[in-house]
Amino acid sequence: MTASTTINKGDSPNGDSSASSVLHQKVLGSRRFSNYWWASIVTLGASGFFLAGISSYLRVNLLIVTDPTQLIFVPQGLVMGLYGTAGLLLASYLWLVILWDLGGGYNDFNRETGNIKIFRWGFPGKNRKIEIGSRIQDIQSVRVDIKEGLNPRRALYLRVKGRRDIPLTRVGQPLSLAELETQGAQLARFLGVPLEGL
């Protein structure tokens, strides 16, 4: 869920977050190592295919590791060029998602003002900034959602009166059970609400 958790104003010396008044949790979005890895791999592979297609058309070797000038342009060079173009489009999308930091943001819980604020970055446009606010007294519980199997899901949700459950954890790689339990218990203790789903 968080890249870091910061507890401000009234930190207790024994690390008890229930004595403080502000809990700020940063949420990691699309700027994860795995996204950088796949964007780099797709860029390299697609560039190779694209340059191989161009090389077979121009009969000029544009690649260091092989000589694609021996390929016949129709159909091999053409198909490699099309694969390269499709791969470069996919790589562009992946790099833009990383640049925009989709899904990144923070969860801010402030007992002094009695407000919570959930902030996430979205796609560019009029709804780029996604902000959800509520009063702490409207929070009913912190819910843990665990689904095992081929596509496991482990997430924390905030159950608020009159609203759908608000997701608090990052999208992508699921958290470990220990980390999920720790963060859920810490948040429930801080807000003074029950922890459901365990």
Swiss-Prot record:
Compartment annotation: Cellular thylakoid membrane
Region of interest (Disordered), residue spans: 1-20
GO biological processes: photosynthesis
Keywords: Membrane, Photosynthesis, Thylakoid, Transmembrane, Transmembrane helix
A single GO cellular-component term on record: plasma membrane-derived thylakoid membrane
Protein name per the record: Photosystem I assembly protein Ycf4
Membership in a protein family: Belongs to the Ycf4 family.
Transmembrane feature ranges: 36-58, 78-100
PANTHER family xrefs: PHOTOSYSTEM I ASSEMBLY PROTEIN YCF4 (PTHR33288:SF4), PTHR33288
Predominant localisation class: membrane
Gene coding for it: ycf4
Role of this protein: Seems to be required for the assembly of the photosystem I complex.
Topological category with respect to the lipid bilayer: Multi-pass membrane protein
